[in-house]
């Protein structure tokens, strides 16, 4: 199969492969154009680009940005993920991604704290170990996988359904930038 993959995640966010491994896996599968679109970070991009230099693979810079869309008619806010491609480094982008990292780290600790009375143990140290001690890389997927490893649930989706999705006792909203502001940052970074 030859093709393009414009939405991938490495283990810098909630993927399973390192950026370097992801590049090699893409080439093995016949992919010729790959966008690394980790959640709220572009930290893996240089690693992927370096490996791809000697391979038949075009890397497109990208990021999946967590944002909020407010529906005026209901005053309700919804979390949305925007896959932004062809991103160039800009000051607004650096500021946004740094804010997102801080929000992500705080949210992960809050979720783990809310889980303590529900599961009878603190799993934060185990979760942070999954991301090499870098708290701002933690996603709910890491928390769900830890709950599976601890045999609290049987599969990651069960962790979401029982504890960490919206409406459940350990859910914490990702309070990111609004949709319009996020799009402005993407455009300021020559992205689309």
State the predicted function of each range:
Residues 63, 84-88, 119:
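Generic hydrophobic/packing signal
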Residues 56-64, 93-99, 128-138, 164-165:
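Short charge-dense sequence patches
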Residues 70-99, 103, 126, 149-168:
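Active-site gating loops and adjacent loop-to-helix segments of metal-dependent hydrolytic enzymes
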Residues 15-16, 105-110, 118-192:
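Divalent metal-binding pocket/active-site signature
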């Amino acid at each position: 199969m030859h093709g393009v993959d414009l939405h991938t995640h490495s283990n810098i966010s909630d993927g399973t492969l390192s950026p370097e491994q992801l590049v090699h896996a893409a080439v093995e599968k016949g992919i010729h154009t790959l966008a690394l679109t980790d959640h709220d970070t572009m930290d893996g991009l240089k690693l992927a680009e370096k490996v791809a230099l000697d391979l038949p693979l075009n890397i497109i810079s990208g990021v999946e940005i967590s944002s909020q869309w407010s529906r005026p008619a209901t005053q309700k806010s919804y979390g949305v993920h925007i896959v932004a491609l062809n991103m160039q480094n800009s000051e607004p982008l650096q500021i946004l991604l740094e804010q997102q990292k801080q929000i992500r780290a705080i949210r992960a600790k809050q979720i783990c704290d809310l889980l303590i009375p529900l599961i009878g143990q603190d799993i934060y140290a185990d979760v942070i170990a999954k991301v090499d001690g870098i708290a701002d890389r933690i996603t709910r997927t890491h928390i769900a996988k830890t709950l599976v490893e601890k045999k609290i649930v049987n599969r990651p989706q069960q962790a979401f359904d029982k504890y960490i999705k919206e409406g459940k006792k350990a859910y914490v909203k990702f309070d990111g930038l609004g949709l319009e502001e996020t799009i402005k940052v993407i455009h300021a970074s020559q992205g689309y």
